Regions:
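Glycine-rich phosphate-binding loops that contact phosphosugars or nucleotide phosphates
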Residues: 1-10, 91-134, 152
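Active-site phosphate/pyrophosphate-binding segments
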Residues: 1-87, 160-177
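Glycine-rich, anion-gripping cofactor-binding loops and their flanking helix/strand elements
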Residues: 73-107, 136-150, 158
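Residue-level marker of positions within ordered structural domains that often coincide
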Residues: 63, 113, 157
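Short alpha-helices
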Residues: 1-6, 127-177
Length: 177
């Protein structure tokens, strides 16, 4: 419990310190992937909801089709879509699931799919673009992954000339009647 509280306390500074490098990486990647019409976002365990959120953000502001999947489900259909023009954004944190995520990345690459891997320092990955973000305690990696994915979506949209402040067909709030 003490370890988690200490890690949580340090997160704001850790995120603040990481943001400039995240923006720089997102700006570097956006022209390289701007011609893609679709993206996969893959994650396992705690990273699966992050993959869903990353795909949603890319769709919302860049208008690029994106789907988030649990990495383990990739072989149940989505893998058929992988090709050189269909990049994959893989969340590959240094946790117990890393070997399985790495295996999924290799599967994508075997089908000539380009991979951006968002990973922690020391990740043993050989991908087209390894995007290293600082490590955080356990599930707190999410707090560092989310801004990176949001900046990637933002920079993609900006590079493509989209209005990032007023995405088309989106309401600022949702009401249920």
């Amino acid at each position: 419990r003490h370890e988690a509280l200490a890690a949580l306390h340090g997160l704001p500074k850790q995120i603040e310190d990481a943001l400039p490098a995240m923006r720089e990486t997102a700006q570097m990647l956006s022209p390289l992937y701007a011609s893609a019409h679709s993206f996969f976002y893959l994650g396992r365990g705690h990273a699966f909801p992050l993959a869903l959120e990353g795909a949603l953000k890319l769709k919302e502001i860049s208008y690029i089709h994106a789907e988030g999947y649990a990495s383990g489900e990739m072989k149940h259909g989505p893998i058929a879509l992988i090709e050189p023009e269909f990049p994959t954004f893989a969340l590959a944190f240094n946790d117990a699931l890393f070997p399985k995520v790495k295996s999924n990345i290799v599967e994508v690459q075997a089908r000539r799919g380009p991979v951006i891997a968002l990973a922690n320092p020391g990740a043993d990955l050989h991908v087209e673009h390894l995007w290293t973000i600082p490590s955080a305690w356990g599930p707190f990696n999410a707090f560092l992954a989310l801004p990176a994915m949001q900046l990637f979506s933002y920079e993609m949209a900006d590079y493509l000339g989209k209005d990032v402040d007023q995405p088309r067909n989106l309401a600022k709030s949702v009401t249920v009647e």
